[in-house]
């Protein structure tokens, strides 16, 4: 079947004749689909030819683009990526939303999780959990990835390290997680293994500031486990607009440090008053930043380790912010000027929505990684109206987008 790709779906797949999804295609491409496969409710083109390129198509910087499942939009020029995301938001939210572009579109990621198998070191092939695409480097992470992967290959060969056979679920070394403070240059390497003995990696990774070893004792395919520091610093550090953050292997942190600066600045701009409650606070990314700007912050999260890290981050920045373990259903939100919510993709818990409607402050700042649940929650928060809404491209070359909304109380 031949035809021209008219548009992309929300996941970044080209749509041919409204019935076949063509991965790694671009609007305006003329394609010939040779083979399809039924997946869930759609037909996916598993083999296709590009007959004529779209004017918005560019050469992908990554050598394994089209195989690796990470950067599905890297073949589309960046302005067109932003237009795609604007149209996606327009369709979901029914309104125009300004998008702040990422300051960098390569070398911006501060974390990658490299699968380490007998056949390849790299990332999952698109749609194939059992297949890993071998890579020499990751352009969205940057130059350090090339050095780290080269050293990892040397380490495996010279120390005769057993690696992962995915289908058999055998082998010792499963993942190497690489993290980098983009504004500090500090590097952390975390080896994720099954039970056994880890040959000393320190001479191979002498460029790292911190080396960790995590043992995954479960049957789950995850890149974390029971953890211990092997060598070097307990934490590496990242810095956003003069505010310091400690990074631990088990910490969640915004993966695009350069755009995270714009994110915290946007949240600060939307906050009204001095007394702020930081829901879903994580490691204190927003709360510590706002406290550094002179606001009185109390934060809550259900993850005890995240709260421990948030309090450490408050301490190293010498700010008066306190963080406590609590679920989103328990927190007393009375007496604050602004509530910040940054929920998981599933959105706000219904009990929190009710409490916000009944007793919420004048202002809510809603940070969302899922426009669809954002829309649902905004409709449920019927005592509030959107006063300002900005999107940030935290994830270049992917279909994902971050939203920050300022909500003002009506009654």
Curated annotation (Swiss-Prot):
GO terms for molecular function: 4 iron, 4 sulfur cluster binding; metal ion binding; tRNA (uracil(54)-C5)-methyltransferase activity, S-adenosyl methionine-dependent. Keywords: 4Fe-4S, Iron, Iron-sulfur, Metal-binding, Methyltransferase, S-adenosyl-L-methionine, Transferase, tRNA processing. It catalyses: uridine(54) in tRNA + S-adenosyl-L-methionine = 5-methyluridine(54) in tRNA + S-adenosyl-L-homocysteine + H(+). PROSITE patterns: SAM_MT_RNA_M5U (PS51687), TRMA_1 (PS01230), TRMA_2 (PS01231). It is an enzyme of class 2 (transferase). It comes from the Archaea. The active site is at 369 (nucleophile), 402 (proton acceptor). The keyword Transferase applies. [4Fe-4S] cluster binds at residues 62, 68, 71, 138. GO terms for biological process: tRNA methylation. Catalyzes the formation of 5-methyl-uridine at position 54 (m5U54) in tRNA. This is tRNA (uracil(54)-C(5))-methyltransferase.
């Amino acid at each position: 079947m031949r035809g021209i790709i008219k548009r992309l779906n929300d996941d970044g797949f080209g749509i041919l004749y409204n019935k076949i999804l063509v991965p790694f295609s671009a609007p305006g491409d003329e394609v010939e689909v040779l083979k399809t496969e039924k997946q869930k409710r759609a037909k996916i083109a598993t083999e296709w030819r590009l007959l004529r390129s779209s004017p918005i198509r560019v050469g992908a910087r990554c050598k394994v683009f089209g195989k690796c499942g990470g950067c599905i939009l890297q073949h589309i020029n960046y302005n067109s990526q932003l237009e795609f995301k604007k149209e996606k938001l327009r369709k979901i939210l029914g309104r125009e939303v300004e998008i702040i572009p990422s300051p960098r579109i390569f070398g911006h990621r501060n974390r990658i999780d490299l699968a380490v198998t007998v056949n390849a070191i790299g990332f999952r092939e698109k749609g194939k959990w059992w297949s890993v695409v071998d890579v020499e480097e990751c352009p969205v992470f940057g130059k350090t990835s090339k050095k780290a992967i080269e050293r990892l290959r040397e380490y495996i060969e010279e120390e005769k390290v057993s690696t992962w056979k995915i289908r058999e679920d055998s082998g010792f070394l499963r993942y190497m997680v690489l993290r980098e403070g983009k504004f500090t240059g500090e590097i952390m390497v975390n080896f994720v293994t099954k039970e056994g003995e880890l040959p000393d990696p320190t001479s191979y990774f002498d460029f790292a500031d911190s080396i960790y070893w995590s043992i995954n004792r479960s049957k789950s395919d995850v890149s974390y486990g029971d953890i211990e520091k092997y060598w070097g610093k307990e934490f590496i550090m990242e810095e956003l607009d003069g505010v310091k953050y400690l990074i631990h292997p088990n910490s969640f942190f915004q993966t695009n440090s350069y755009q995270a600066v714009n994110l915290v600045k946007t949240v600060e701009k939307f906050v009204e008053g001095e007394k702020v409650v930081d829901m879903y606070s994580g490691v204190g990314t927003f709360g510590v930043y706002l406290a550094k700007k002179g606001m009185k912050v109390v934060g809550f999260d259900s993850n005890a380790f995240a709260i421990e890290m948030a309090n450490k981050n408050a301490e190293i920045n010498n700010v008066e912010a306190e963080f406590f373990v609590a679920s989103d259903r328990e927190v007393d939100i009375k007496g604050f000027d602004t509530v910040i919510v940054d929920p998981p993709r599933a959105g706000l818990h219904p009990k929190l929505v009710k409490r916000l409607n009944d007793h919420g402050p004048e202002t809510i700042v809603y940070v969302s990684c899922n426009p669809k649940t954002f829309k649902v929650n905004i409709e449920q928060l019927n005592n509030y109206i959107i006063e300002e809404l900005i999107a940030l491209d935290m994830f270049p070359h992917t279909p994902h987008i971050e939203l920050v909304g300022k909500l003002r109380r009506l009654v």
